[in-house]
A protein has these predicted regions:
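Hydrophobic/basic alpha-helical segments
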Residues: 1-179
Length: 179
């Protein structure tokens, strides 16, 4: 975690030195192509759950937004929502039996009981005693998967990009209602 944040800061400071007089689109493009991939590499699986770690990652993006747009409130999608979408897409690939995710997909189980309000693609969450187990990739993602509305998952199987667009729409509608 510390290595990733340090590497992202180095890349961001490099961009800030080189593009000091560049326009905002160039700065944004440099951030999204050079810094964001560092912050998101493998983020679907190692998504941090502690507030301090999440704040460290968000500080890098806020600094880049301030540098790019000269404002404190960026209109960019938050890193947390991007990681959540990536986790849900990865679980979809495991649920669909994609070869790279087969080890996880083989261990997914349907719940013993479904209420009428639940969708039929619900996955049973595993009980864990430790924080490492509770907040692991699989358990956190299953919790979010089960909270998705039936319309998003209703027409599976579909392409991962289609699912990503649907989930993105649901997450952004939910976040706009909270504001």
């Amino acid at each position: 975690m510390n290595y990733t944040v340090k590497k992202a800061w180095k890349s961001l400071h490099f961009i800030m030195r080189i593009l000091r007089k560049g326009n905002s689109n160039t700065k944004r493009l440099a951030y999204t192509s050079l810094v964001r991939p560092i912050l998101e590499y493998g983020a679907a699986c190692w998504d941090p759950y502690r507030e301090g770690q999440i704040r460290e990652l968000d500080r890098v993006q806020k600094k880049a937004a301030k540098f790019s747009h000269h404002t404190k409130s960026p209109t960019w999608e938050t890193l947390a929502s991007r990681r959540k979408i990536a986790r849900l897409c990865a679980l979809y690939k495991a649920y669909g039996g994609e070869r790279a995710w087969k080890a996880i997909g083989d261990r997914l189980e349907r719940p013993h009981y479904l209420s009428r309000a639940d969708h039929n693609l619900k996955i049973r969450n595993r009980r864990q005693r430790t924080d490492i187990g509770k907040y692991s990739f699989v358990n956190r993602t299953i919790e979010h998967w089960n909270q998705l509305p039936a319309e998003v998952l209703g027409t599976l199987p579909c392409k991962p990009n289609t699912l990503k667009k649907r989930v993105n729409k649901v997450i952004h509608v939910a976040s706009s209602k909270m504001c």
